[in-house]
Amino acid sequence: MAISPWKQFKLSVLNANQWFRKTPERALNMAYDAANKIRSIEEEHFEGRKISNVSISYSNSTKSYFNSQLNRYLKIIQVRLAEFNTSISVVGTLDQNKVDKQKDKFDQNYQQEFPGRSSIILDKLEFIDQVSSRYYKSSNHEAQELNTDLEIPHSSSSIAIVSSNVNVNNYPNNVRAGSSQNQNNLAELKSNIPNTNFLPRSLLKTFKKIKQELDPEAETEVIRKFRKSQIKTLTSVRFILLVILVPLLIHQLSKITFVGYLVDNFMSLPHQQAELFLNSNMEEEALVKLHQYEEKLHFKMYLGQAPELFPELYESGKEITEIPKSEREELIEHKVEKKAQEIALEYKAKGNNGIKNIFCDFISLITFVIIISTRKRELEVLKSFMDDVVYGLSDSAKAFIIILLTDMFVGFHSPHGWEVILENITRHFGLPESRDFNFLFIATFPVILDAVFKYWIFRYLNRSSPSAVATYKNMNE
């Protein structure tokens, strides 16, 4: 008996409806099978550990095969979970009362049994999360939460977890390590991959922007990104203040407490009393200062300004000409002797201060190293913050900063600045100033620094911001 076209059409619609309603279960099963295959590879070839290149004695070809299989299964999990989430939300909103009661028995049983399978669905999703999350978590997950490359919340679903893993595992093994150097290599590799799109990038960006503006979750996403940026800024500023202020406070506290006490007591010992000056430069400065003071006394006495220097002479009502020369010289010698004692105490304190600075700076350096080593998460956040600030500048601003720094440290007038810096450093530590060392340093270090600047511009800035390099060359010319 022939079936009428209307019944054939109605049966086709029912079959299509049945196929569509089985889409969530079908997609979940495919994702579950892919997760099972990943787990099988882990147990058979990696002793139950995650698939990686660490401490596994396989050849490069074998490792490449395992990685390709891992990427394939992770991609299946990503796509099928996206299909599951989309289809389950659509199927759940359908009005069950409008479904034709005459559809086949299998479809009716499926609709009745599907709500009771929630525990099975949850078990499968939990297993998929357990397998795929191993390739999402890294050894420093907290530091990567605020990284600019990671825009996914910590409590994301399996789709977000797998998506981040696929993006990392799509590259060779030697760029999938957790260190910052490998992250830089990964970014460099991504930048070298040619992007051959049929449509222009500007048009695609416009479509993407319109899509984001029409997204009902766009406002929530903007607020989330703003809060994330705010937390990143506050964390970076707090870390900068911590790195600067804590070593300075430790330096001052140690100088006025135990370090200062120990140095002062040691330098006041009898065998140290004879050493008035820490180095020959201090002694030369003290002698010049004493000689200038003596010449000043003679000069003012000849000009009749002695009342300020010798008030005891004028209490008796005598003039300078009435005082014998030998007596005047004796008074000047007495003043010079008193001044010499003051200068000796002054330069003795300067020498002690230089020794204190050596120990206190060493303690501050240890404090700085401890802060850096114990605050790696804040250090990663600061690095991300500085990247945002630097790469957020315009090309003209970048070129201006580069020219300012190069002219300041390696430019024509930089030797005078380096000379002042070296003199202050030697005085800070109480060391003798060496003109030969200063000239040698000025002749070599700025040249090395200039070579480093040029290499950085050629190697990195020329790739990340070619327009900034062009602007820099035009401004420098």
Swiss-Prot record:
GO cellular component terms attached to this protein's record: plasma membrane
The species this protein was found in: Trichodesmium erythraeum (strain IMS101)
Protein name, entry field: Proton extrusion protein PxcA
Main location: membrane
Pfam families with a match to the protein in the record: CemA
Membrane topology term: Multi-pass membrane protein
TM ranges: 239-259, 354-374, 437-457
Subcellular location: Cell inner membrane
Gene giving rise to this polypeptide: pxcA
UniProt GO MF annotations: proton transmembrane transporter activity
Membership in a protein family: Belongs to the CemA family.
Lineage of producing organism: Bacteria, Bacillati, Cyanobacteriota, Cyanophyceae, Oscillatoriophycideae
Keywords tagged on the record: Cell inner membrane, Cell membrane, Hydrogen ion transport, Ion transport, Membrane, Transmembrane, Transmembrane helix, Transport
Function: Required for H(+) efflux immediately after light irradiation to form a rapid H(+) concentration gradient across the thylakoid membranes. Together with PxcL, contributes to transient H(+) uptake following dark to light transition.
Source domain of life: Bacteria
